Amino acid sequence: MAAAMPLGLPLRLLVLLLVGRGCCGCAEGPRDSLREELVITPLPSGDVAATFQFRTRWDSDLQREGVSHYRLFPKALGQLISKYSLRELHLSFTQGFWRTRYWGPPFLQAPSGAELWVWFQDTVTDVDKSWRELSNVLSGIFCASLNFIDATNTVTPTASFKPLGLANDTDDYFLRYAVLPREVVCTENLTPWKKLLPCSSKAGLSVLLKADRLFHTSYHSQAVHIRPICRNAHCTSISWELRQTLSVVFDAFITGQGKKDWSLFRMFSRTLTEACPLASQSLVYVDITGYSQDNETLEVSPPPTSTYQDVILGTRKTYAVYDLFDTAMINNSRNLNIQLKWKRPPDNEALPVPFLHAQRYVSGYGLQKGELSTLLYNSHPYRAFPVLLLDVVPWYLRLYVHTLTITSKGKENKPSYIHYQPAQDRQQPHLLEMLIQLPANSVTKVSIQFERALLKWTEYTPDPNHGFYVSPSVLSALVPSVVAAKPVDWEGSPLFNTLFPVSDGSSYFVRLYTEPLLVNLPTPDFSMPYNVICLTCTVVAVCYGSFYNLLTRTFHIEEPKSGGLAKRLANLIRRARGVPPL
């Protein structure tokens, strides 16, 4: 009996460890998940838009739990949430401009350059300090110039940027928003963005993210969105959602050699070989709305796994769905090259005009005064709807608020809500928010005059004659929908439904950005200091050299020397002739 105890005790401990480990795994369940998708949309202008989204969900409360182990969720971003008490973070890098008039409403539009807006927890005491430190950290993570975000380009909107996730308190004191319109997006920003993906660029949809192809496009935008969401239907606990999105627009006539045909290999120079093994869903959607293979106008190959219909941005869409986890889709040819071919040239139809689009420009002459004008287009034939307009103007453009005019159809249009925060020289920019009602089938013009300020010579950029950028206007609106949509469960629906929030069946939310402006300021002639230095140095050198010679040299009178034998003989002959001597 005494000899059996040492053998039985380890056996019991082993059983307890195995049972405890199994029970812990059963109770905890999967704590994180990954879904990836690609939406390919032929645009009305003939271009092709491709939108990637990689959604990582982590069933963990980073604010309360001491998290030390990370599996799919990036550790760098998880530590940011914990250290700076973040509620939401939205960061985008964009090259180019989304042309709403020709490409239609965007899936996820972002302004040109870099945009960052963050909601902090209400436990943060010094929001400005956390904002500065966060922008510097993000600058290092994404190899960007976000460290140039300071008080001169940071604002706190009151109504334009509400939390997209769970929010018990919406006090705008904890919100910060900034745009760097002159930020240049390059491969150095894409590489760290891809490293945040669980499969990096080794498998799944991320193998298509080839830098030389993505930046050879008409439009390129990559973003990171972090927000808290409900873990279950009763919202008893919180999960964190990371959405990494990337949108590009290919010129079909360039990639297709003058034709509207396209394929994955032609656009990305690569094909799909396998799904990401860490993902629970990997789908490719091809927009075939308005086209049918029955009428023999186009051919989509290979045949899709299934088709899906839904109301997206107020329009009923039909998608061909390709599931990368379908063994028959990949194993037959070891690669998936989705392609669309037109059997006959498509009809040249008029481009559909979106219900809401905007345009912004600067007018005036000279370098003293000017005018900022924004045109808001409501193309709906019989529906009027309100638009929330946000303008952030640098401090060196001094706005004349009394010159603000809003006209629609030749009549004055008074905003129902207006918030203005004046600028302070070298401290904060102008902030102007207005809620404007756009009449049906109308063009509303918002204009305000400004005066250019004189900068210090140390405040000019390295290329001041190029001009100074003004961040674009932001439009937020509930646009009337053509087709009634029913709210769906975003967990049970396809992944891209989370990109397009539906408030009710009659309208949908959209956020648009206008073009960034380039304004010239009074610029001194920076070559004059060079000319003055050269002239001054020359004069000083000449004067100094002359005075130096006078002060350091000694002068002696040299006695004339008598001539030689020949000269004396010549003088004798001249005297004999009565001629003066030499």
Curated annotation (Swiss-Prot):
Gene Ontology cellular component list: cytoplasm; cytoplasmic vesicle; GPI-anchor transamidase complex
| Ranges facing Lumenal side | 26-529
Disulfide-bond pairs as recorded? 199-276, 230-235
Q: Which UniProt keywords apply?
A: Disulfide bond, Endoplasmic reticulum, Glycoprotein, GPI-anchor biosynthesis, Membrane, Signal, Transmembrane, Transmembrane helix
Pathway of action: Glycolipid biosynthesis; glycosylphosphatidylinositol-anchor biosynthesis
Provide the topology term for how it sits in the membrane: Single-pass type I membrane protein
Is Glycosyltransferase included in the keywords of this UniProt record?
no
Q: Which residues are glycosylated?
A: 168, 295, 331
Q: Which residues cross the membrane?
A: 530-552
PTM characteristics: The disulfide bond between PIGK/GPI8 and PIGT is important for normal enzyme activity.
Mapped to this chain, the residue ranges on the Cytoplasmic side of the membrane are 553-582
A biological-process GO annotation? attachment of GPI anchor to protein
- Signal peptide annotation: 1-25
The residues the record assigns to binding a 2-acyl-6-[6-phosphoethanolamine-alpha-D-mannosyl-(1->2)-6-phosphoethanolamine-alpha-D-mannosyl-(1->6)-2-phosphoethanolamine-alpha-D-mannosyl-(1->4)-alpha-D-glucosaminyl]-1-(1-radyl,2-acyl-sn-glycero-3-phospho)-1D-myo-inositol are 465, 525, 527, 531
Top-level lineage group = Eukaryota
Spell out the subcellular localization from the entry: Endoplasmic reticulum membrane
Q: What is its main location?
A: endoplasmic reticulum
Q: What are this entry's molecular-function GO terms?
A: GPI anchor binding
Name the job this protein performs. Component of the glycosylphosphatidylinositol-anchor (GPI-anchor) transamidase (GPI-T) complex that catalyzes the formation of the linkage between a proprotein and a GPI-anchor and participates in GPI anchored protein biosynthesis. May play a crucial role in GPI-T complex assembly in the luminal layer. Binds GPI-anchor.
Question: What does the record note on quaternary structure?
Answer: Heteropentamer. Part of the GPI-anchor transamidase complex, consisting of PIGK, PIGT, PIGS, PIGU and GAA1.
Q: Which family does it belong to?
A: Belongs to the PIGT family.
Q: Which PANTHER family match?
A: GPI TRANSAMIDASE COMPONENT PIG-T, GPI TRANSAMIDASE COMPONENT PIG-T-RELATED
**Under which name does UniProt file this protein?**
GPI-anchor transamidase component PIGT
Tell me the organism. Mus musculus (Mouse)
Gene name of the record: Pigt
